[in-house]
């Protein structure tokens, strides 16, 4: 592509995303399907604005690379070790069983057995980008099904290497003997990357962070991600696997959150580009010519994978309420099929339209997943949001809640228990299906689903409730829910959980004054106890805690106008100095009044 062509393609991609994704969200079909439809519209079989799909598809794989780096940051090595059984047990079983069944079905058609084996392996893989995105959207990350789904995807990435090595063997074009020297050099290079990353990455980032220039830190992060991807690609390994390992090596470092913040905007844009390019690759000519066969192939592919995944989830002991989520989110074909089938085609394993039919099947199966997950959500909603069983008697028999609690993790549970202990009528909205049944048994009125859906809020009694307590894990969900409540349920008193100062600023800007920073109060209480153990009078330590809380809140409010502004950095330093001066001055005054409590403070 020429430089001007790349610029034009970039403008078209941005326009397609800006136009299609909000429309898709408004129609309720999700952003991923919106990207895919946008790709079809601007691709060679749509309006024809872009014709060089293969080059863009290869570049857009960087979205998956960035996503795997962020996933790696969230998993430390000890956590990864805990997942070893699900990775090499369920993951291996899924690939082998799905590949065997699908290859057998392909052999019943016109596929030679070699082409059927390659086709079965390629179709057995799932889309890492789509599955992880949907798992995040559905709140499956921390659930049992989400952890198992990630394990399966990780094994599939590991299986890329032997799958690609198998193609020349099946084609009969492999060398009579392996180049063991070449293989040994690749293994040594991979081990060198692990050792070098383990001992060099943290000192390097410490040196870069000391410069205080944020742009350099972002550039270093991009260099790490792209460099590790390029290195693994040169070794003939998965680029996504390389960046995942780099993320794991930095998961326990002090720069984890800063790295995630630096990468996140690039990840989102490149993932969108990936889905658009997948949509562009859909060959509508093959679809029109072989419509019936393609529809049958998509249905069979999704059905076989759901069957295998559901049975494995049952054998693994996954709760019945989570099995369909696990099976549905991994039921599509994946991006690896494009690479494997292209390699097989270059070795002349496929005949006629076989490769085109397989690729169309994979692409359409990816488009079915968001719709399938919506059907699963509706089924789960009917299953768990229906009338409660007679033996599950709630503490309060009033259908109109006083309070709606959104999210019932560790933070929300404390609030819920306090309210229930004081005979308040509460309704809980929770996206983790595994927790819904358990909470109902203990008398909570629980609705499964996404609280950012207005219909679910109405069903939960938002129009009659007095307050809503938002304890979402994701700040984006919190702010979206605040906006919805202010627009549709303005009578509600909004109380929210803030993960830190940034979220606190956003809540204040949105007009939410009743919020709690999740670690602030507990840290202050522990600090007060520390002062007492150091010899400070208990009254003086209590007053010190109150002063610090008041002054910190004042500083928080003063910094609102400069939120997300570079000036905030210098102002924050100035505010800290001011806080210290005021704190010392007021504490000197307190030392003269060690007796008595100021009830008006």
UniProtKB/Swiss-Prot annotation:
The chain crosses the membrane at residues 4-24, 29-49, 55-75, 87-107, 115-135, 152-172, 177-197, 207-227, 230-250, 268-288, 291-311, 324-344, 356-376. One of its GO terms (biological process) is proton transmembrane transport. One of its GO terms (cellular component) is plasma membrane. It comes from the Bacteria. InterPro entries: Cation/H_exchanger_TM, K/H_exchanger, K_H_efflux_KefB, Na+/solute_symporter_sf, NAD(P)-bd_dom_sf, RCK_N. Residues 400-519 form the RCK N-terminal domain. The keyword Repeat does not apply. PROSITE patterns: RCK_N. It is a multi-pass membrane protein. One of its GO terms (molecular function) is glutathione-regulated potassium exporter activity. Pfam families: Na_H_Exchanger, TrkA_N. Keywords: Antiport, Cell inner membrane, Cell membrane, Ion transport, Membrane, Potassium, Potassium transport, Transmembrane, Transmembrane helix, Transport. It is found in: Cell inner membrane. Interacts with the regulatory subunit KefG. PANTHER family: K(+) EFFLUX ANTIPORTER 3, CHLOROPLASTIC. Pore-forming subunit of a potassium efflux system that confers protection against electrophiles. Catalyzes K(+)/H(+) antiport. Belongs to the monovalent cation:proton antiporter 2 (CPA2) transporter (TC 2.A.37) family. KefB subfamily. This is Glutathione-regulated potassium-efflux system protein KefB. It comes from Escherichia coli O17:K52:H18 (strain UMN026 / ExPEC). The gene is kefB.
